[in-house]
Amino acid sequence: VKVGSGAFMKEIDQARELASTMVALGTDAGVTTRALLTDMSTPLGRTAGNALEVAESLEVLAGGGPADVVDLTVALALEMCAAAGRPVEEDQARAALADGRAMDIWRDMISRQGGDPNAPLPLAPETETVTAPADGVLTTLDALAVGVAAWRLGAGRARKEDPVQAVAGVTMHAKPGDEVRAGQSLLTLHTATPERFTRAREALAGGIVISEAGSPEAADAVARRERGVILERIG
């Protein structure tokens, strides 16, 4: 259950109540049910968008990928294995990613369903870069702002009949807690329709904050990053 600016539940008390209700309903139905409360105040991983996130997921299956995505993937796998009565240790789960077994199983799943695991993912023909306006520490990269920007680039729909661009989205080159320099690339915007860039940049206004190194805001951003993406476990 996600909580934060980019989630349906903005406050942790709301998310906790929803998670507790879902766990209780599942348990009452005789199904082993657990929930994780996860931080969505800033985007998970380094991408937002359809093909971009698939590519990032494949990096994780191949033993790489962003640490926060790996941590959440492993945590969910441990919970699901335990709920199924086949518990595993964390180091076993991480080893399955690191040694390629997870990727091998994914490739086999795709092949058995008639797909091609070697099929290339599409790339956006148009990109633009968003740069840091000043030196300092990136203290805010708001998940809602990034999500709206990705949507305006074509990654989502305003109406159910609207087409979705598989290639559209945002790549993040820095996360809250990182030191940045003026002019450094913070984001890459991806789309098939370059006229979308202006409104995507407008969506990001106010969603990116750079604070002075050594400030309380910078220290808080580093502390939040070190805390990790998993806030609570319920059930």
Labelled PLM ranges:
Residues V1-G235:
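Well-ordered secondary-structure scaffolds
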